[in-house]
A protein has these predicted regions:
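Conserved acetyl-CoA-binding loop-helix of GNAT-fold acetyltransferases
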Residues: 2, 112-125
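A short, internal acetyl-CoA/4′-phosphopantetheine-binding micro-motif in the GNAT/acyltransferase core
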Residues: 104-112
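Extreme N-terminal basic, low-complexity initiation segments
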Residues: 1-9
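Conserved GNAT acetyl-CoA-binding A-motif
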Residues: 127-140
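A conserved beta-strand-loop-helix scaffold within acyl/acetyltransferase catalytic domains
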Residues: 65-74, 80-81, 86-98, 102-105
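Short amphipathic alpha-helix that is part of the acyltransferase structural core
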Residues: 26-70, 75-80, 156
């Protein structure tokens, strides 16, 4: 059933749909499980609880990143097999088919195992599914973003990745 809703998810990854409720609003969330270079399974999913966003903020602060979350931000987080937060990214929707990716961070202990690569790939799949065609980032970590297909486009004031939208 999850594959019918999200046909662009890699068949090598295990996916599940988890229902969460916030007040009166019920939501289906896609959870992807992926194996990294350390041979361990990691989960990639949106936050289910406000405290997960608070923990993500702590990871950003530990990485010397000064950030302010707003109600327009959306999050995609990574967790280890003991459900400990290992990193994530956050973005905001701009107009129709554009999002601005604010920051990507992985805790030091979990770097160099391709977790950020899996997270970015998952993020691109989700954005593609949502009909997003353009992802912009600032001029930071240019090597990292270039590896993920971002190119400098002055008219967007930063680096840009153009997705092949399904719609």
């Amino acid at each position: 059933f999850a594959r019918m809703l999200f046909p662009n998810v890699d068949s090598a990854d295990y996916i599940e749909l988890v229902a969460t409720t916030h007040g009166h609003e019920a939501r289906l969330n896609l959870v992807t499980q992926t194996e990294c270079k350390d041979g361990k399974i990691y989960r990639i999913r949106p936050p289910f609880l406000p405290k997960e966003i608070a923990r993500f903020h702590s990871i950003l602060t530990e990485s010397s990143l000064s950030v302010t979350f707003t109600s327009s931000h959306e999050f995609l987080l990574t967790f280890n097999n003991r459900n400990r937060l290992t990193g994530g990214l956050y973005w905001k929707k701009l107009e129709n088919n554009r999002v601005h990716l604010e920051w990507v961070v992985i805790r030091k202990k979990y770097q160099k195992i391709e977790l950020s690569k899996r997270l970015m790939s998952d993020f691109f799949d989700r954005m593609n599914h949502d009909g997003i065609g353009i992802i912009t980032v600032g001029f930071y970590a240019q090597k990292f973003f270039a590896k993920h297909g971002f190119k400098i486009e002055k008219q967007h004031g930063g680096m840009v990745k153009r997705l092949q939208t399904m719609g």
